[in-house]
């Protein structure tokens, strides 16, 4: 392996760079995990040194994309957002009847659409000053949330390692009619629990997620326990896979479990 799993497994605390390296290599992630930081102080936000800021207004999905795929540290505030759903979920504005009109397509019922809107996870109204997204491996601050775009079997392994690392036997998630990424971040932050949801219309079309992936969110304070469990488990079994016999290199090798026709023997 290119990664020294044995050495990492002996460390009491991993750096964010080591966490990212372990997760990207062992889970075979397609994208960088994204560290998300919420700024509640205007001065702290203004003084934060980012590599990039949005030019035109963007969605949260597009802003996170720059960290997930282009390795940039980005900061943004309400003035940078064109996505009304994100403004509401991040507490930059209050929910309104006008916003309900855009939700009726999900319910075919205006009153129930309003109920669905008001049930979304939201950060405290008027408190957030801005936010940062950065590749986990180069985050300059402790993240509030770590956001990942993963396939189903990657999610399976990540969440199982969360369970093992945090000693929490089951997990439950929050799905809303849209606002998958912004609402997913808000719910993870508010509840301090992992979250997983499908793409919404915005995250599918604006977030460059065309391959049917899932959105996954881990509380920032828990990412060390998750990554630590991953490297300890891999060191014990020889590989990260939990599918079939443990210890294979690829998490989610696409073969039938215990199929007698898929069997290898030593070469002569």
Region spans (language model):
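Acidic, serine/proline-rich low-complexity intrinsically disordered regions
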Residues: 3-268
């Amino acid at each position: 392996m290119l990664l020294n799993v044995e050495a990492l497994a002996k460390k009491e605390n991993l750096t964010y760079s080591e966490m990212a390296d372990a997760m990207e290599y062992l889970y075979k992630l397609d994208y960088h995990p994204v560290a998300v930081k919420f700024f509640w102080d205007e001065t702290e936000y203004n003084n934060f040194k980012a590599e990039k800021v949005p030019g035109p207004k963007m969605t949260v999905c597009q802003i996170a994309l720059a960290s997930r795929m282009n390795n940039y540290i980005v900061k943004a505030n309400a003035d940078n957002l064109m996505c009304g759903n994100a403004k509401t979920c991040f507490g930059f504005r209050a929910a309104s009847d006008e916003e309900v009109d855009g939700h009726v397509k999900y319910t075919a019922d205006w009153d129930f659409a309003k109920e669905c809107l008001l049930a979304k996870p939201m950060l405290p109204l008027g408190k957030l000053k801005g936010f940062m997204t950065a590749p986990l491996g180069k985050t300059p601050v402790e993240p509030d949330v770590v956001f990942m775009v993963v396939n189903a079997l990657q999610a399976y392994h990540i969440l199982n390692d969360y369970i093992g690392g945090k000693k929490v036997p089951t997990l439950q998630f929050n799905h809303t009619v849209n606002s998958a990424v912004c609402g997913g971040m808000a719910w993870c932050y508010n509840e301090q629990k992992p979250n997983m949801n499908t793409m919404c219309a915005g995250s599918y079309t604006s977030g460059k997620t065309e391959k049917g992936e899932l959105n996954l969110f881990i509380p920032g304070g828990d990412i060390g326990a998750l990554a630590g469990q991953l490297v300890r488990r891999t060191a014990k079994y020889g590989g990260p896979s939990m599918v079939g016999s443990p210890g294979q290199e690829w998490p989610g090798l696409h073969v039938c479990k215990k199929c007698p026709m898929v069997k290898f023997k030593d070469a002569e």
